[in-house]
């Protein structure tokens, strides 16, 4: 995996690719390398901020807000360059994401907090991510793992187009040859599995860890 990105179609002429900051340079290199006849121009931007809003539930249902599917809505009555979309983390845990100009950061944060949104610090979000087995960031998205090991089969299109690694991933899936899997373990109760051959912790907090383990060592 080079990275997993979200694409925001702002208009017919402009797409925003949201990527992991630490994977940015490698991602740009690969896009440039495999862009041939298409008229695509990449411009790096650090002008936007992205906020995920979510609940403990995996699904979000709206009663008074029309945001179907993953359509992007733009709000320009109060803020300029403010976009909102219903989407999900990479484990399909649904979120509502806000994308906006960084100059609005303090104002947007204050509005959300005034509406009883709770802000998670890095440690709390890390624990949430581990508990829900959400691959997120360079620890999971790197050249050491393939999408099937990270439970990302829902992001793979086995029919559309022709892309690097497509044939390898298709064979792994068709013949059930994926040997590893990303799971969550309690660090105290699972010492043997954590220390088993081929296991690799990707993220951890005080009590639990998200770890790649060989499937033969777990009951599936």
Feature locations, PLM:
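Acidic, low-complexity central loop/insert segments
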Residues: 6-135
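Glycine-rich, small/acidic residue-mixed loop/short-helix segments
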Residues: 1, 5, 122, 126-128, ...
